[in-house]
Amino acid sequence: MNAIQISWVLAAEDSARLATFYSELFQATLKPGLAEHHCIVQFSDGTQLEIYQPSRRRPFPARGKALAPCLRLSPSQEPLPELQRLLSNALQRGGSLLEEARLEPFGAEAWIQDPEGNPLLLLAPLESVAPTS
């Protein structure tokens, strides 16, 4: 299981508005994300900023703590088991769980902290909804 992409994720109350702000400010490409409330800003160097409205199942991140790296796995028909394997590996190596892995309409996700306490989103997209490059 290899990660295919690392990007940044930014929680927003209005993801479309914030994505438009960043794409226009940096003359970057605005792409649709995995869901209606998810947008991807693609910069000229290939870096991506994924702007999303958090699930109602989790609290909105505190201001100033809404930006985190996202480790996106290869799309899968069975994203939750893929994510759980990576999560188990991360915990064995000193990471800690912030939020349990859960299945969402776009795939599976879990929030962890690295050994120094930095937040990290682990994302396993559902193969049928994975965005194309």
Q: What residues fall within each predicted segment?
A:
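N-terminal beta-strand motif that seeds the catalytic metal site of vicinal oxygen chelate
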Residues: 1-20, 69-73, 126-133
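Core segments of cupin and vicinal oxygen chelate
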Residues: 2, 9-49, 56
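Short, conserved charged micro-motifs
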Residues: 16-18, 77-85
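Short amphipathic alpha-helices in soluble, non-transmembrane regions
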Residues: 23-25, 85-90
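Short, charge-rich, low-complexity interaction segments located
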Residues: 58-62, 131-132
